[in-house]
Regions:
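C-terminal ends and interior cores of transmembrane alpha-helices
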Residues: 1, 235-249
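Hydrophobic core of transmembrane alpha-helices in multi-pass small-molecule transporters
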Residues: 1-20, 253-269
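Intracellular loop-helix junctions on the cytosolic face of multi-pass helical membrane proteins
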Residues: 2-11, 17-20, 24-25, 31-157, ...
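Intracellular juxtamembrane helix-capping segments at the cytosolic ends
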Residues: 19-32, 268-282
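Loop-to-transmembrane helix entry/capping segments in MFS-fold secondary transporters
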Residues: 34-44, 194, 281-293
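Loop-to-transmembrane helix entry
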Residues: 42, 172-206, 254, 327
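Helix-to-loop junctions at the C-terminal end of transmembrane segments
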Residues: 210-225
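A late C-terminal transmembrane helix in Major Facilitator Superfamily
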Residues: 283-315
């Protein structure tokens, strides 16, 4: 069906973005000395924050340029189509630019490198190496993996559920039934609310950018306790998500503040775990361990997409809050708060 096809393409999109981004995290760790890695990951987060804000506002921007914001039932509005098309072009262009413009330092002993590459080639060896590295993961990587699970489950919940949850709960304009008598009026109100949600979501990109700027300034001059910063950042995002439960059409302006808090956690998620991890793994295994670490990003999103969000949200509603779409945002907040608590138990001996 069309729904399953859309879900399938969403998974492919998510997987391709994660796979293409992973080598760049390893590249940051490879190119920078240990003392500057926190700084490098934070700068990367700053750039991601700028992109997040621009992307979140693309539907609104192309609407101003004349793209239609409404569509018949079962069709995609022009504003959404053009926003995704622009995003695809920028994504491919930035990947190609980085690939062709970034140099990598050659191995110190090229002959030894080529010899080892020849000995260790083949699919079976690659599978065996990954399996052995998974079994031998450093303890801090396992601990961070649990934190990453809750963090990325929360954000996938936001990406997939924020619009239907917030248009109805905060703006009082849920998506209308196709057989509604005044469908056109209700659909127009829904699309306006959806644009407002998208614009508000752009704030989390701005706040993550501002947070990254502060961290960039701070980490370039002083040592930081990355564990505490990450824990507090996740807690801020958790509060932002749960705050949404108490918003109404009269207080909808506060939605931007909710996303501002969420942006703080987003800025930390994209930098602090990698900065912590890069100090604990051998440089020669940086790529494979960063790849394995990426599994802790992909798995929660797969579980969420396959029904984890719906099941947990229904359990939360049946037990505490009653059945309502906004419960998905509360679930995201609970996940970030759990991640915040678990972060405090990570053993980090050094700072950078």
């Amino acid at each position: 069906s069309a729904l399953w096809m859309a879900a399938g393409f969403l998974w492919i999109l998510d997987a391709s973005i994660n796979i293409s981004m992973e080598p760049f995290r390893s590249l940051v760790a490879d190119k920078l000395p240990e003392s500057q890695r926190s700084y490098g990951f934070v700068v990367q987060t700053l750039i991601i924050g700028i992109g997040t804000w621009v992307a979140s506002n693309l539907p609104w921007f192309v609407t101003l340029l004349g793209a239609k914001n409404e569509a018949a039932p079962g069709e995609i509005p022009e504003s959404v189509f053009y926003a995704f098309a622009i995003g695809a072009f920028v994504f491919i262009s930035s990947i190609l630019f980085t690939v062709f413009k970034t140099s990598e330092a050659p191995p110190e002993d090229m002959d030894e490198f080529l010899s080892n590459k020849k000995k260790n080639s083949g699919l079976l060896f690659g599978v065996k190496e990954i399996y052995e590295n998974i079994l031998g993961m450093p303890k801090v990587m396992k601990q961070l993996g649990v934190v990453q699970f809750f963090s990325w489950f929360a954000f996938f919940t936001m990406w997939s559920s924020a619009t239907p949850a917030l248009t109805g709960s905060v703006f009082g304009a849920p998506y209308p039934a196709s057989d509604a008598v005044n469908f056109d009026v209700l659909n127009s109100a829904y699309n306006e609310a959806a644009n407002a949600v998208s614009s508000s979501m752009g704030v989390y990109g701005l706040s993550s950018m501002a947070f990254a700027l502060v961290l960039t300034f701070y980490t370039s001059r002083l040592q930081i306790n990355r564990k505490i910063i990450h824990s507090l950042s996740l807690a801020a995002g958790g509060v932002g998500f749960i705050w949404m439960l108490f918003l109404s059409p009269e207080s909808s302006n506060n939605l931007k503040w909710c996303f501002a808090l969420i942006g703080i956690s987003w800025g930390s998620i994209l930098s602090m775990p990698y900065a912590i991890l890069s100090d604990k793994i051998p440089k020669e295994k940086m790529g494979v361990y960063m790849g394995i670490f990426n599994m802790f990003i992909v798995f929660p999103q797969i579980i969420a997409a396959l029904g984890g969000i719906n099941w947990l949200t229904s359990q939360l509603g049946n037990t505490f809050l009653g059945i309502q779409l906004i419960n998905s945002m509360v679930l995201a907040g609970i996940c970030l708060l759990l991640g915040s608590i678990i972060t405090l138990f990570i053993k980090e001996k050094s700072f950078s």
